[in-house]
Amino acid sequence: MVNHKKIVLVLGNGFDLDLGRKTSYRNFAESTFWPFKGEKNGLGGYLDSHKKKEKWFDLENLLREYASSDKKIVPFVRNIQIDEPAFYRLKNSLMDFIKKEEVIKLNEESIAVYLLKQLCPTFDTASALKVYSFNYTDLNKVFNYLNIREGLRVDCEYIHGTLQNNSIILGIDEKVNCYPKYEIFIKTMQPTYESHPILKDLFFADEIIFFGMSFGDIDYPYFQIFFKDRCDENKYYEEFNRKRIAIFTRDVQSGQNIKLQLMEMNERRLMQMYNFNELKFFYTEDGITDELKDYLNDIWHNDTK
């Protein structure tokens, strides 16, 4: 049996968290790798002060606020000569922190592991599985750890760089009106930023799986055009245009947050997205359900072409 489906798997930090890695920005801020403990001034002081008072510590959003010329940061004073080296120190410390988490024992009972094992085809591997990771960790190390890499043809691109060559991309989106010289915080301005055909692959995929993505303000520009297209009633009538889209997230509340982000991206046409596609949400806290088993089994045993 040969399956000709095109499958795209998009991984966010929730994927690493489900594997058992403590890689959230909150974990980083509370670790011994945090570089700004006790600092009172500049970028370091600004970030450290918010670490103490915010339950949800969104590092990149805080960088966004700090760099924005529209945002007052009283009592902190911007000074690029101090903040630029602090920014690079932040990136280096984050890399050291994640390298430590990358080598821990994985939770083999997790939904993330179950998904990877089920996506390994048990028949002719003619189907194309393309992976896009927004994480800094090496997916090949996960495959090797689980002994499922051999014979599996996986093409993985790392949107924000990897730890392997110290090329991680940390920063903000380009819509921010930056304070002079703070454009260095913008992801696309960083020298290691590269092009990726993620939008093209999403458009041509039959099956799309998002795992651990929050679709927050920093990253949703990657997907906004795609999700708008998925709600276009004119496209719905085109042959073979219906897509199966699965979103894996932790629980119902995080699912609700994602739906709000989707409505923000597609002009509040979430109903059309459900109607014009086969959209499913899976919650990792529910474990391995019959619905999840049926969904993954259907990927490999129902050819769309």
What are these regions (language model features)?
Residues 37-204:
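Extended, H/D-rich, highly charged conserved domains that either
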Residues 28, 139-143, 226, 258:
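Hydrophobic packing residues within well-ordered alpha-helices of enzyme cores
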Residues 1-19, 147-148, 197-305:
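SIR2/sirtuin-family catalytic core signature
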Residues 19-33:
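Active-site neighborhood of HAD-like aspartate-dependent phosphohydrolases
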Residues 17, 21, 165, 170-172, ...:
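Generic structural "secondary-structure junction" signal
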Residues 1-2, 30-35, 39:
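Short hydrophobic membrane-inserting helices
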Residues 15, 25-28, 134-136, 222:
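Aromatic side chains
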Residues 33-37, 180-186, 233-236, 273:
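Glycine-rich loops and low-complexity Gly/Arg-rich segments
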